[in-house]
Amino acid sequence: MLFTLGWASLAAMFSFSIAMVVWGRNGDGTLNF
């Protein structure tokens, strides 16, 4: 259970970072970090 939860959170963080990179290269500008 704990291993599955950790793996799911790791995959979520990885996909989120990929999405941030894609949005950054897109030059959307709605999210200003």
UniProtKB/Swiss-Prot annotation:
The protein's role, per its UniProt record: Component of the cytochrome b6-f complex, which mediates electron transfer between photosystem II (PSII) and photosystem I (PSI), cyclic electron flow around PSI, and state transitions.
Compartments it resides in: Cellular thylakoid membrane
SUPFAM superfamilies in UniProt: PetN subunit of the cytochrome b6f complex
Lineage: Bacteria, Bacillati, Cyanobacteriota, Cyanophyceae, Synechococcales
NCBIfam families xrefs: PRK02529.1
Region forming the signal peptide: none
Keyword Transmembrane helix found: yes
A Pfam family hit: PetN
Domain of life: Bacteria
Transmembrane segments: 2-22
A Gene Ontology BP annotation from the UniProt entry: cytochrome complex assembly
Protein name: Cytochrome b6-f complex subunit 8
Record note on quaternary structure: The 4 large subunits of the cytochrome b6-f complex are cytochrome b6, subunit IV (17 kDa polypeptide, PetD), cytochrome f and the Rieske protein, while the 4 small subunits are PetG, PetL, PetM and PetN. The complex functions as a dimer.
One Gene Ontology molecular-function label: electron transporter, transferring electrons within cytochrome b6/f complex of photosystem II activity
Keyword tags: Electron transport, Membrane, Photosynthesis, Thylakoid, Transmembrane, Transmembrane helix, Transport
